[in-house]
From Swiss-Prot:
One of its GO terms (molecular function) is ribosomal large subunit binding. Its main location: cytoplasm. It comes from Mycoplasma capricolum subsp. capricolum (strain California kid / ATCC 27343 / NCTC 10154). GO terms for biological process: translational termination. Coiled coil: none annotated. Keywords: Cytoplasm, Protein biosynthesis. NCBIfam families: frr. PANTHER family: MITOCHONDRIAL RIBOSOME RECYCLING FACTOR PSEUDO 1, RIBOSOME RECYCLING FACTOR. Belongs to the RRF family. The gene is frr. It is found in: Cytoplasm. The lineage of its organism: Bacteria, Bacillati, Mycoplasmatota, Mollicutes, Mycoplasmataceae. One of its GO terms (cellular component) is cytoplasm. This is Ribosome-recycling factor.
Length: 182
């Protein structure tokens, strides 16, 4: 029973790491990446659709994103959605595609993004710790379990937690390095 609780906690922590990776990919680094547009939702014939599902997004140059909507009629809606997403991007549209030049980030913007990443890191660490707390509470509720077994499982949960917290820290350091590299 306790093994199931441990596996479930580890799975939840892994999902938290995956969510953090997705979040980090969406932070602008001064290099063109289609991932920064992942959360952009476009009004597509009355329903909101992710931009990456109604268009082809490419990065032919390190400082340029090109969006080719599958339907030309959605270009103005897509440009509006990109502006509305408040990503600090300035899309330029023509008849068939949208170009988004990516300006290099200033040092102040880079430092603010690093602060933002560290703030987000704390939120994800709290999620991991909450999973640890919930798992320990579940283990304590198991009937006919000795105090030694509870203690052993608490140690195992802590080791798992430490492993995932270290992964979060490593991902953050990597993103910080990427942000501060000009």
């Amino acid at each position: 029973m306790t093994d199931l609780i441990l596996k479930n906690a580890e799975l939840q922590m892994k999902e938290t790491i995956d969510a953090y990776v997705i979040h980090l990919r969406q932070i602008r680094t001064g290099k063109a990446s289609g991932a920064i547009l992942d959360k952009v939702m476009v009004n597509y014939y009355g329903s909101l659709m992710p931009l990456n599902q109604i268009s082809q997004i490419t990065t032919p140059e390190p400082n340029l994103i090109i969006i080719k909507p599958y339907d030309r009629n959605v270009i103005t809606e897509a440009v509006g959605a990109i502006h509305k997403a408040d990503l600090g991007l300035n899309p330029i549209s023509d008849a068939t595609l949208i170009r988004i030049p990516i300006a290099p980030l200033t040092e102040d913007v880079r430092k603010n993004l690093v602060k933002k990443v560290h703030k987000e890191l704390e939120g994800y660490k709290i999620r991991i710790r909450n999973i640890r707390r919930d798992a320990i509470d579940e283990i304590k509720k198991v009937e006919n379990i000795s105090k030694d077994l509870i203690s052993d499982n608490e140690d195992k949960i802590q080791q798992i937690t430490d492993k995932f917290i270290k992964q979060l820290d490593d991902l953050t350091k990597e993103k910080e390095r990427e942000l501060m590299t000009i």
